[in-house]
């Protein structure tokens, strides 16, 4: 028997976003000033906590949900939300499950969500708010205007972060060509990449909650975040302290460690250096490093990663690659004459454009 994958809070919020049938039903309930208790899933675990009510098994419609919620009991939907399975049922979850909620409806919703693993929605008629519970987490739905205002402020912050990231990335590229990279230069870029990623996650959650109202915001976010994940991976490939180019497992582990850093540690270059395998002293920040060349070669059009990897493993560093002739590059197994010339020209153009940017 296959294990059933339960939805996450993010997935549940996406199902309740503006433009969805469920959101339409919830807004009708709010306008009608009635409360509601809705279970977004049905199986034997849900059936075990249902008492009374009646079975329906009819196609879901926002108007039907609104009418059924006029009764005191809970409404149970099918797992895919396409059908209304039961109505006017009393939910009887395990009372020993801890909850911080005070209202009877909200306590039942939180306990039912924990016990069944399915999202449970509670609509408060007195406070006129909708709360969704998913496996011990809760989220209060917010109107689109409030989310858009918050998200637009975050977009403005992201734009400033992205501008600063572009500046320090160009500075690092110049230092790489001139062979004068310090650990501090690298950690500055790492920090900025992570800051951009984190605020992007915050905005992305808002976009999910906005549903159809967040289309324009999604386009802005995708444009600002384009290439950020690739840049994070490339800087780990270039500067991980491992003597050999890091494996995929090492890269993922390093990125996971960066993800796990607190906001305070993210501002500490020594904490960032530790993640990359370098000494955590302040003095070490001024030590010089030699990039492997992955990041630089990523700027060469049409160059496949497999070819770049072969060249890095053959020449060791970016400076070794810059000093190599087309013939030297062609001597690497797997690199033909055409690719050797292409890489040689690409590296030369990269060096010229980087220096001219000064």
Swiss-Prot record:
Annotated GO molecular function terms are: adenylate cyclase activity; ATP binding; diadenylate cyclase activity; DNA binding
Q: Which UniProt keywords apply?
A: ATP-binding, DNA damage, DNA repair, DNA-binding, Magnesium, Manganese, Nucleotide-binding, Nucleotidyltransferase, Transferase
pH dependence statement: Is more active at pH 8.0 rather than at pH 7.0 or pH 6.0.
- InterPro entries registered for this protein in UniProt: DisA, DisA_sf, DNA_integrity_DisA_N_sf, DNA_integrity_scan_DisA_link, DNA_integrity_scan_DisA_N, DNA_integrity_scanning_protein, RuvA_2-like
Q: What does this protein do?
A: Participates in a DNA-damage check-point. DisA forms globular foci that rapidly scan along the chromosomes searching for lesions.
Per the UniProt record, the source organism is Mycobacterium tuberculosis (strain ATCC 25618 / H37Rv)
| Regulation acting on activity, per entry | Diadenylate cyclase activity is inhibited by the interaction with RadA.
Its quaternary organisation is:
Homooctamer. Interacts with RadA.
Any Gene Ontology biological process? DNA repair
Report the EC code(s) recorded for this entry.
2.7.7.85
Keyword check for Protein transport: no
What does this protein need as cofactor? Mg(2+); Mn(2+); Co(2+)
EC main group: transferase
Question: Which reaction is the catalytic activity of this chain?
Answer: 2 ATP = 3',3'-c-di-AMP + 2 diphosphate
Transmembrane segment boundaries: none
The residues listed in the UniProt record as binding ATP, with positions renumbered to this chain, are 73, 91, 104-108
Family per UniProt? Answer: Belongs to the DisA family.
| Pfam families listed in its UniProt record | DAC, DisA-linker
Q: What is this protein called?
A: DNA integrity scanning protein DisA
Listed disulfide bonds for this chain?
none
Q: What is known of its domains?
A: The N-terminal catalytic domain contributes to tetramerization and the C-terminal domain provides additional dimerization. Both domains are required for full catalytic activity. The C-terminal domain may play a role in stabilizing the active conformation.
Please state every residue range assigned to the domain named DAC. 6-144
How the cofactor is bound: the record states: Magnesium. Can also use Mn(2+), and, to a lesser extent, Co(2+). Cannot use Ni(2+), Ca(2+) and Fe(2+).
């Amino acid at each position: 028997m296959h294990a059933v994958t339960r939805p996450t809070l993010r997935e549940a919020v996406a199902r309740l976003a503006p433009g969805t049938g469920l959101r339409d039903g919830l807004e009708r309930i709010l306008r009608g000033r009635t409360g509601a208790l809705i279970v977004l899933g049905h199986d034997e675990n849900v059936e075990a906590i249902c008492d009374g009510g009646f079975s329906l098994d009819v196609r879901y419609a926002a108007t039907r949900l609104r009418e059924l919620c006029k009764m005191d009991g809970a409404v149970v939907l099918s797992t895919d939300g396409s059908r209304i399975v039961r109505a006017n049922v009393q939910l009887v979850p395990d009372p020993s499950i801890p909850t911080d909620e005070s209202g009877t409806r909200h306590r039942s919703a939180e306990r039912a969500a924990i016990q069944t693993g399915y999202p449970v929605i509670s609509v408060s008629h007195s406070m006129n708010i909708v709360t969704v519970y998913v496996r011990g987490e809760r989220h209060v739905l917010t109107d689109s205007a409030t989310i858009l205002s918050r998200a637009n402020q975050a977009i403005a912050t992201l734009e400033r972060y992205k501008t600063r990231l572009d500046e320090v990335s160009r500075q690092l590229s110049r230092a790489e060509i001139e062979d004068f990279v310090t650990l501090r230069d690298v950690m500055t870029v790492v920090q900025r990449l992570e800051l951009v990623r984190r605020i992007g996650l915050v905005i992305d959650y808002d976009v999910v909650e906005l549903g159809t109202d967040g289309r324009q915001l999604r386009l802005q976010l995708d444009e600002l975040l384009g290439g950020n994940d690739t840049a994070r991976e490339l800087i780990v490939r270039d500067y991980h302290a491992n003597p050999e180019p890091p494996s995929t497992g090492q890269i993922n582990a390093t990125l996971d460690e960066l993800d796990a850093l607190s906001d305070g540690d993210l501002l500490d270059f020594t904490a960032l250096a530790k993640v990359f395998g370098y000494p955590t002293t302040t003095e070490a920040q001024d030590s010089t490093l030699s990039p492997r060349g992955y990041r630089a070669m990523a700027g060469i059009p049409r160059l496949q990663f497999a070819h770049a990897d072969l060249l890095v493993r053959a020449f060791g560093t970016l400076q070794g690659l810059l000093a190599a002739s087309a013939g030297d590059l062609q001597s690497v197994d797997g690199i033909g004459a055409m690719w050797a010339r292409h890489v040689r020209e690409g590296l030369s153009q990269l060096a010229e454009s980087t220096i001219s940017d000064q």
